[in-house]
Amino acid sequence: MERHALTLKTLGHPERLRILALLSRGELTVSELVQILNLSQPRVTQYIKSLETAGIIERLKEGSWVFSRIKRGNAAISALVATTLATLPPHDPILEADLRRLEDVRAERSIAADAFFANVANDSGTLGDEYIPKANIESMLRKMAGKGPFDYMIDLGTGTGRMLEVFADRVTRGSGIDNNVHMLKVARHKLAENNYNHIRVRQGDLNSTPLESGLADLVTLHQVLHYLDDPQSAIIEAERLLMPHGILLIADFEAHNQDEFRSDYAHRRLGFDDKDIDNWLSSAGLKLSRVETIKTHSTRPNVKIWLGQPALNSQSKKAKS
């Protein structure tokens, strides 16, 4: 009872509601919230602490950045938060202005990321070669996927199409989705050069692809999640695309604190731990079936590969639909 009372009391404040509405769109740092809300940093920090004390949000430290996000796990509090968000006025001018500024913040990030990827595309294949044993990672991905053959593969955030090449001999058809035209230009050239006529790439938002549900028996997210504002959204989209007995392979860096990955490589997130991935998979109706770690060179963070599959209840729903 006391916890419910504290939650309701904390939610009964307009500025904290603004923060909650923004965090419902994804994780944000204090500096980003300050920029969006036009409030002082001490005030924003105070509101965040109140929301954290009430069990509504949690903070995640990565390197020198600290992200705030809505906390999951307590069903009662989550229900109160969901109800509160659902009852917020949809056309409130203050909330609408906040969302516009949120899009501005994301657009700034996107411009910087696009410039980075344009440079990567012009020098294709060099990113991370000195840090990560790509051959070992690709070999493990093939091993975890199994021999197939797969009817339809979808690679979300395909970049230069490397994952499509890796699985080209095991798929009947393949599609790669990416927003960056420079990367897709390289991908098309490489696929054509290798006569992979059964594989295509197209421009699109990996969080909301133009593809039908339940198409793929193999979906990959290779070194993609660390660039995203909302990694869970990509996993939800991957689940939508999966057949009832399909598999999702996620490859990304293990959680680390090397801030230069943000400045040098435009990473939004500094890797992930098993708990993060497991929670996101579970929320999307998937189960974490296997985890492998690939050791990297020198002091650089290791790469992990997570295999997700539709949970039993999710398989049943997909089969009926």
Where are each of the predicted segments found?
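A short acidic, Gly/Pro-enriched loop at the edge of an enzyme's catalytic core
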Residues: 207-219
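A short SAM/SAH-binding and catalytic strip from SAM-dependent methyltransferases
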Residues: 217-230
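Class I SAM-dependent methyltransferase SAM/SAH-binding core
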Residues: 152-154, 160-208
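N-terminal helix-turn-helix DNA-binding core of bacterial DNA-binding proteins
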Residues: 2-43, 66-73, 142
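A short glycine-rich, Lys/Arg-flanked "PGG" loop and its adjoining helix->strand segment in the class I
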Residues: 232-247
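Amphipathic alpha-helical dimerization/coiled-coil segments
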Residues: 76-125
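C-terminal alpha-helical "lid/dimerization" subdomain adjacent to the S-adenosyl-L-methionine
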Residues: 247-302, 306-307
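Conserved alpha-helix/loop element of class I SAM-dependent methyltransferases that forms part
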Residues: 132-151
